[in-house]
Curated annotation (Swiss-Prot):
CDD domains: ABCD_peroxisomal_ALDP
UniProt-listed InterPro entries: AAA+_ATPase, ABC1_TM_dom, ABC1_TM_sf, ABC_transporter-like_ATP-bd, ABC_transporter-like_CS, ABC_transporter_sub-D, P-loop_NTPase
Keywords from the named record: ATP-binding, Membrane, Nucleotide-binding, Transmembrane, Transmembrane helix, Transport
GO MF entries: ABC-type transporter activity; ATP binding; ATP hydrolysis activity; ATPase-coupled transmembrane transporter activity; long-chain fatty acid transmembrane transporter activity
Binding site for ATP: G551, P552, N553, G554, S555, G556, K557, S558
One cellular component term from this protein's GO annotations in UniProt: peroxisomal membrane
Family the entry assigns: Belongs to the ABC transporter superfamily. ABCD family. Peroxisomal fatty acyl CoA transporter (TC 3.A.1.203) subfamily.
Protein name: ABC transporter D family member 2
Species classification: Eukaryota, Amoebozoa, Evosea, Eumycetozoa, Dictyostelia
PROSITE patterns in the cross-refs: ABC_TM1F, ABC_TRANSPORTER_1, ABC_TRANSPORTER_2
Residues passing through the membrane, by range: 39-59, 119-139, 260-280
SUPFAM superfamilies xrefs: ABC transporter transmembrane region, P-loop containing nucleoside triphosphate hydrolases
Length: 741
């Protein structure tokens, strides 16, 4: 049946005159070329490879080298300075001389010598690839002979052919499974070698500290992402790239050699010519997958970072009741990943459609032409063969042509994987280059920058002329207090519609009661480990009565505030306190949210929340000016500037930001945990004066005696479960009326 189909197809083609004339011209071309090719078979194969596979590789690498003109939108939440020239330079990911130089350096790390396990594994993988190609050629020969015997009804030969196929399938199965295993193991060995090298260099001395704190221009983002995920992806990509490159090239050599023997050089040349044209067409539409891959890794690193920040600053965020804001940040970060991944998947889909049409289906059409032309032209005696011989040649040549077209197609698609690998190579190389730069710099001293050499932010600021310094701050603070009181009244009215005032909540073994003051009645503070920190605590704080809390480390000072913030359950007793939004915690190391300068002041509010409250940027400037008299912050940055504020701000500026945040929210009670240690005595005094004007009652954790002037009571923990409550006599500057337990 197969032979009849082939004969009918050829007869139909020959009956069409127009097609026949075209085939006659091709026949003369093929015949002349066949007689002119008198050199060795190796020379013929070399010419075909030079015209075919080499051209495809050049096309793809030329495409990759000149990619990068496309632009991709950046992060909604950027964890580094977008204006950094260093970052802009790093974001360029191309397959160029820099890529090959970086790749060569990494290869010398993962394959240190010819005697290494990695190189031996590479040799074994090469042998498996060669064996697989030879087995494919054998299977094609067996399939062709089996088809011939089937058409000729030679059942004995057919049985022997099936037996040969079964015998060949045994080593073929072993080779196929071993190829997958060795590819994975090679990637794993690469990762082990590269990870150990990075660990050695990154953790040598204090390089890890310098990388995150003293890196300067060499500091990079998401070092943890690069050390873990990016190294893994790079090693997987490099291992896969070797098999993707070597096997198609080997198939190209062996299958072309076999096809030239049985079909002549015309059909392979036609196939090569088609793929050259399709390669140039593909070059025109190929997106910059290398840069998109690097962007994907960056977004994944940012997503991991926001989760790490949540874990690291969990207590501060809980005190601020910032879960809603953090959820928005995390959702935005994941949204960036979702949008970018969807965009990349869409591009891959379009490229896949183009690849499927050109590389698979159109290549099959060209392959059919390659199969028909040798038979029609009579090359290699095809015209004199009977139907069984034609069937054998058809089946065998079909399998060889399919394998050859797949090999060429893989070489055409090789550029995709190279550009993807370029993204991971860039990420890993930046990490290695940063470590090398830090080691070369060693312990060299910092360069002194004189004030005359840099622009003065106080005179070159975009908001320098916008801030009105003539405002009477006392009057403005009084007005701010009235506005805050009105806002609090509205919020309470809205809240009371859904819950009764003075609500009682049983939490753990004790009871929380809502009130306008703070009172502890027979409260024992127990740590999560079961340690009794404070026993039977009993005191009361009315509005405008500031309390100073002292005691040794681990005595229960911070634990008291965890009880107030309802982070810990009550072991026993009763706590009367205002609503959670009326108590604000200011830690020693302020929490700085991902976002703009404005977000640092209004956290956990959003910009829309701020507008709904009727607060303007001018109000924020006045609040910040109360703790930053020299206006160093508001004159150096705009409110919409986005930076890594943890590194951009000094210790004193961070504490000023935290106090401005306190004044913005203006709670009834505030807990200050050594939060003024980095500001001057003058600014510190102004902070306490402002709190008094705004009607904020303070709990201050501090051991500095000079702060007693701003407080009315002292709560002392002795570290053994005992405590002492005393009133401060400001006339004699000492404590009186102690109440101990």
């Amino acid at each position: 049946m197969e032979a009849n189909f082939v004969s009918s197809a050829l007869a139909g083609v020959q009956n069409n005159r127009s097609v026949k004339r075209s085939l006659d011209r091709l026949k003369s071309l093929f015949s002349s070329g066949q007689h002119q090719l008198n050199g060795s078979l190796g020379k013929k194969v070399f010419i075909l490879l030079a015209l075919g596979g080499g051209a495809f590789s050049l096309v793809k690498f030329y495409k990759a080298k000149n990619e990068g003109s496309s632009k991709q939108s950046g992060l909604i939440i950027d964890l580094k300075d977008k204006n950094s020239k260093k970052d802009k330079k790093r974001n360029v990911t191309r397959v160029d001389a820099v890529f090959f130089r970086r790749l060569a350096k990494i290869i010398r790390i993962v394959i240190p010598s010819l005697k290494s396990k990695e190189f031996l594994s590479l040799l074994y993988l090469t042998a498996l690839l060669f064996a697989r190609t030879m087995l494919s050629v054998s299977i094609a020969e067996i399939a062709g002979k089996n088809a011939q015997n089937l058409v000729a009804r030679k059942w004995k030969e057919m049985r022997n052919g099936v037996l040969k196929f079964a015998l060949v399938s045994i080593p073929a199965s072993f080779v196929n499974a071993s190829l997958k295993y060795e590819t994975d193991m090679l990637a794993l060995r690469f990762r082990k070698r590269l990870s150990e090298y990075v660990h050695k260099e990154y953790l040598e001395g204090v390089n890890f500290y310098k990388a995150s704190h003293l890196g300067g221009a060499d500091r990079i983002d998401n070092a943890d992402q690069r050390v873990t995920s990016d190294i893994e992806q790079f090693c997987n990509s490099m291992s896969s790239l070797y098999t993707t490159l070597f096997k198609p090239f080997l198939d190209l050599v062996l299958f072309t050699r076999k096809l030239v023997v049985v079909m002549g050089w015309g059909s392979p040349l036609l196939m090569f010519s088609y793929f050259i044209v399709s390669g140039f067409l593909k070059k025109l539409i190929m997106p910059p997958f290398g840069r998109l891959t690097a962007k994907q890794s960056e977004l994944e690193g940012n997503y991991r970072t926001v989760h790490q920040r949540l874990i690291t600053n969990a207590e501060e965020i809980a005190f601020y009741d910032g879960s809603r804001k953090e959820r928005q940040i995390i959702n935005l970060s994941f949204g960036d990943i979702y949008n970018h991944t969807g965009y990349v998947s869409y591009l891959k889909c379009l490229v896949g459609i183009f690849d499927g049409f050109l590389v698979k289906y159109c290549a099959s059409i060209v392959g059919y032409g390659c199969m028909v032309l040798p038979i029609y032209t009579g090359i290699r005696g095809s015209s004199g063969k009977d139907s069984t011989e034609l069937t054998k040649d058809y089946i065998r040549n079909t399998q060889l042509m399919v394998a050859l077209s797949q090999a060429i197609g893989q070489l055409v698609l090789l550029g995709n994987k190279v550009t993807l690998m370029a993204g991971y190579t860039s990420r890993v190389s930046e990490l290695l280059e940063m470590i090398k730069s830090i080691k070369e710099r060693g312990t060299s001293q910092f360069t002194i920058v004189h004030e005359d050499d840099v622009p003065n932010p106080l005179t070159n600021s975009p908001v320098n002329d916008k801030y009105d310094t003539s405002v009477d701050m006392s009057s403005w603070l009084e007005d701010w207090r009235k506005r805050s009181d009105q806002t609090r009244i509205v919020k309470r009215q809205q809240s009371n519609r859904s819950s009764a005032s003075g609500a009682t909540t049983v939490y753990g073994g004790g009871t929380f009661v809502e009130g306008d003051f703070i009172k502890f009645e027979n409260v024992s503070i127990v740590s999560p480990e079961g340690k009794l920190l404070v026993e039977n605590l009993d005191f009361q704080v009315m509005p405008n009565q500031n309390v100073m809390i002292t005691g040794p480390n681990g005595s229960g000072k911070s634990s008291l505030f965890r009880i107030l913030g309802e982070l810990w359950p009550l072991h026993c007793g009763t706590v009367i306190k205002p609503r959670k939004e009326d108590i604000l915690f200011v830690p020693q190391k302020p929490y700085l949210v991902l976002g703009t300068l404005r977000d640092q002041i209004i956290y956990p509010h959003s910009h829309d929340d701020m507008k709904k409250l009727g607060v303007t940027d001018d109000d924020l400037q006045h609040l910040l000016a109360t703790v930053d008299p020299n206006l160093t912050i508001i004159r150096q940055w705009n409110w919409d500037d986005t930076k890594d504020w943890f590194t951009a701000l000094s210790g004193g500026q961070k504490q000023r930001i935290a106090m401005a945040r306190l004044f913005y929210h203006r709670p009834q009670y505030a807990i200050l945990d050594e939060c003024t240690s980095a500001v001057s005595d003058e600014v510190e005094g102004k902070i306490y004066e402002t709190c008094k004007k705004l009607g904020i009652t303070l709990f201050t954790v501090s051991h500095r005696p000079q702060l007693r002037a701003y407080h009315d009571y002292v709560l002392l923990f002795n570290g053994r479960g005992g405590w002492e409550w005393s009133k401060i006599d400001h006339d004699d500057d000492h404590l009186k009326k102690p109440l101990s337990h």
